[in-house]
Swiss-Prot record:
<comment type="similarity">
    <text>Belongs to the tRNA pseudouridine synthase TruA family.</text>
</comment>
<keyword id="KW-0819">tRNA processing</keyword>
<dbReference type="InterPro" id="IPR001406">
    <property type="entry name" value="PsdUridine_synth_TruA"/>
</dbReference>
<dbReference type="Pfam" id="PF01416">
    <property type="entry name" value="PseudoU_synth_1"/>
</dbReference>
<keyword id="KW-0413">Isomerase</keyword>
<comment type="function">
    <text>Formation of pseudouridine at positions 38, 39 and 40 in the anticodon stem and loop of transfer RNAs.</text>
</comment>
<dbReference type="GO" id="GO:0003723">
    <property type="term" value="F:RNA binding"/>
</dbReference>
<dbReference type="InterPro" id="IPR020094">
    <property type="entry name" value="TruA/RsuA/RluB/E/F_N"/>
</dbReference>
<feature type="active site" description="Nucleophile">
    <location>
        <position position="52"/>
    </location>
</feature>
<protein>
    <recommendedName>
        <fullName>tRNA pseudouridine synthase A</fullName>
        <ecNumber>5.4.99.12</ecNumber>
    </recommendedName>
</protein>
<dbReference type="GO" id="GO:0160147">
    <property type="term" value="F:tRNA pseudouridine(38-40) synthase activity"/>
</dbReference>
<dbReference type="GO" id="GO:0031119">
    <property type="term" value="P:tRNA pseudouridine synthesis"/>
</dbReference>
<dbReference type="InterPro" id="IPR020103">
    <property type="entry name" value="PsdUridine_synth_cat_dom_sf"/>
</dbReference>
<dbReference type="InterPro" id="IPR020097">
    <property type="entry name" value="PsdUridine_synth_TruA_a/b_dom"/>
</dbReference>
<comment type="subunit">
    <text>Homodimer.</text>
</comment>
<feature type="binding site">
    <location>
        <position position="110"/>
    </location>
    <ligand>
        <name>substrate</name>
    </ligand>
</feature>
<dbReference type="InterPro" id="IPR020095">
    <property type="entry name" value="PsdUridine_synth_TruA_C"/>
</dbReference>
Length: 250
């Protein structure tokens, strides 16, 4: 038996998220159908986590087990021949049988991209969120520092989030401006449902002068969603960039 690890890139616009669900097409479902067609049998595919409807990925990690003696390149190319144009396998490699893409993940890097422009951009509308008006970028950067470290992120999760614990560790959070584009790069141990999108909404309110760095600090002191954290920004600006592992997959 072999454990095959895939690095997957996808445009999440047309999908109801990553995970298979009864009502709506998902990325995992499409990949499992392609796997079944290639291998001639139904094969479960386990991902490193979930992305919500409309969210994209450059570095989703998933694994499947097979006894097929195919070269690694054949797995990648075979799947890409069967997948639609908005999903692609970027890499395929063999990892130890005990490796699990979710449970062995050490950290994840998400990026949220905002277009700071009064004019809409038809070519980028599916991968950025356009925001009119000016932002105080320096104030937003100061607020980013408050998120770094281990905190209770109860105030930064969706109301239907079912996570057993709301404590997470943020390793780094940076704002990078490239012309009209503003990227929020967040690297953390894990994320609650809608957490990055709510953090982004909170930072925007800091940039608009509606919240202060002190307000952010108070929200991180074990608050809940009713404590007026920021809005949940739209999904299209969010992208899973990379999942990090230690020795089991390096």
């Amino acid at each position: 038996m072999r454990n095959i690890k895939l690095i997957i890139e996808y445009d999440g616009t047309a999908y109801c998220g990553w995970q298979v669900q009864p009502n709506g097409r998902t990325v995992q479902e499409v990949l499992q159908e392609a796997l079944a067609a290639m291998l001639g049998e139904k094969t479960p595919l386990h991902g490193s986590g979930r992305t919500d409807a409309g969210v994209h990925a450059r570095g989703m990690v998933a694994c499947f087990k097979t006894d097929k003696a195919m070269p690694l390149r054949a797995f990648r190319e075979g799947l890409n021949c069967l997948l639609p144009g908005d999903i692609a396998v970027r890499e395929a490699c063999e990892v130890p049988l005990e490796f699990h893409p979710r449970f062995d993940a050490h950290a994840k890097h998400y990026r949220y991209t905002i277009l700071l422009d009064d004019l809409r951009s038809p070519l980028s509308r599916l991968t950025v969120w356009r925001l009119k008006g000016k932002l105080d970028i320096q104030a937003m950067r100061a607020a980013c520092a408050a998120f770094v470290g281990e905190h209770d992120f109860a105030a930064f999760r969706a109301s239907n989030c079912a996570a057993k614990t709301t404590v997470r560790r943020i390793y780094s959070m940076d704002l990078v401006q490239e012309g009209c584009l503003l990227h929020l790069d967040v690297k953390g141990s894990g994320f609650l449902k809608n957490m990055v999108r709510i953090i982004t909404g909170t930072l925007i309110e800091v940039g608009q002068g509606k919240k202060s760095v002190e307000d952010v600090a108070r929200l991180l002191q074990g608050g809940d969603r009713q404590q007026n954290s920021g809005m949940t920004v739209p999904p299209q600006g969010l992208c899973l960039m990379q999942v990090y592992y230690q020795e089991k997959c390096d």
